[in-house]
Amino acid sequence: MSTLIYVDKENGEPGIHVAPKDGLKLGSVPSVKALDGRSQVSTPHVGKMFDAPPALPKTARKALGTVNRATEKSVKTNGPLKQKQTTFSTKKITEKTVKAKSSVPASDDTYPEIEKFFPFNPLDFENFDLPEEHQIARLPLSGVPLMILDEERELEQLLHVGPPSPLKMPPLLWESNLLQSPSSILSTLDVELPPVCCDLDI
């Protein structure tokens, strides 16, 4: 058994026990308990007790014990449940993806008239290049003056003329003569304006 040491409240000396006044008035009698055939005298103790079991009732200890056990079990069971939940969530995600893949052909069956429409490509309507048969990018057009076509000739005849060669030169149809001086070219651009009328009163 564990040894009990009593400390008096007033002087703090061990081994000295003083009965309180309230206990004397009530006529408290030491109670005798029989345990294992032995008689033990239990007297009311005053002061602090060291190395003694707590004075809580057994029901309270059991309740606290069951609460502690329940929390420990819940903590232990929470770990595997989280792992199971993650496995279930991954399974659900894979099932959803499989269902989504299987549902894609069903959408084509529900709308078969979409395939009957003409395909629309906006780049086809924004292409301003000439066809390959009428490309003029290969012609050396640097330094060429303004060209005026005869009314009898058509555009296709001009486009079918190949690049200029020194042996076969097509007839040049220029607006001005290449041998003219710049002053003569400027004189052709002069336009006669009507005479200024100064007689009008403003």
From Swiss-Prot:
Give the start-end ranges of region Disordered.
36-55
What protein name does the entry list?
Securin
Superkingdom of this entry's organism?
Eukaryota
Can you name one GO molecular function term for this protein? SH3 domain binding
InterPro entries associated with the record: Securin_separation_inhibitor (IPR006940)
Give start-end ranges for motif TEK-box 2. Answer: 94-96
Q: Which organism is it from?
A: Bos taurus (Bovine)
What are the subcellular locations of this protein? Cytoplasm; Nucleus
A GO BP term, please? DNA repair
Q: Which UniProt keywords apply?
A: Cell cycle, Cell division, Chromosome partition, Cytoplasm, DNA damage, DNA repair, Mitosis, Nucleus, Phosphoprotein, Proto-oncogene, Repeat, SH3-binding, Ubl conjugation
Q: What is known of its domains?
A: The N-terminal destruction box (D-box) acts as a recognition signal for degradation via the ubiquitin-proteasome pathway.
Q: Which GO terms describe its cellular component?
A: cytoplasm; nucleus
| Positions of transmembrane segments | none
Instruction: Give me the gene this protein comes from.
Output: PTTG1
Q: Which residues in this protein are found as Phosphoserine?
A: 165
Which Pfam families does the entry mention?
A: Securin (PF04856)
Description of post-translational modifications: Phosphorylated at Ser-165 by CDK1 during mitosis. Phosphorylated in vitro by ds-DNA kinase.
**Summary of the function given for this chain in its UniProt record:** Regulatory protein, which plays a central role in chromosome stability, in the p53/TP53 pathway, and DNA repair. Probably acts by blocking the action of key proteins. During the mitosis, it blocks Separase/ESPL1 function, preventing the proteolysis of the cohesin complex and the subsequent segregation of the chromosomes. At the onset of anaphase, it is ubiquitinated, conducting to its destruction and to the liberation of ESPL1. Its function is however not limited to a blocking activity, since it is required to activate ESPL1.
Per UniProt, the short sequence motif TEK-box 1 occupies residue numbers 71-73
Q: Which PANTHER family match?
A: SECURIN, SECURIN-3
Return the motif ranges for SH3-binding.
163-173
Family per record: Belongs to the securin family.
Motif, D-box: chain positions:
61-64
Q: How does it assemble?
A: Interacts with RPS10 and DNAJA1. Interacts with the caspase-like ESPL1, and prevents its protease activity probably by covering its active site. Interacts with TP53 and blocks its activity probably by blocking its binding to DNA. Interacts with the Ku 70 kDa subunit of ds-DNA kinase. Interacts with PTTG1IP.
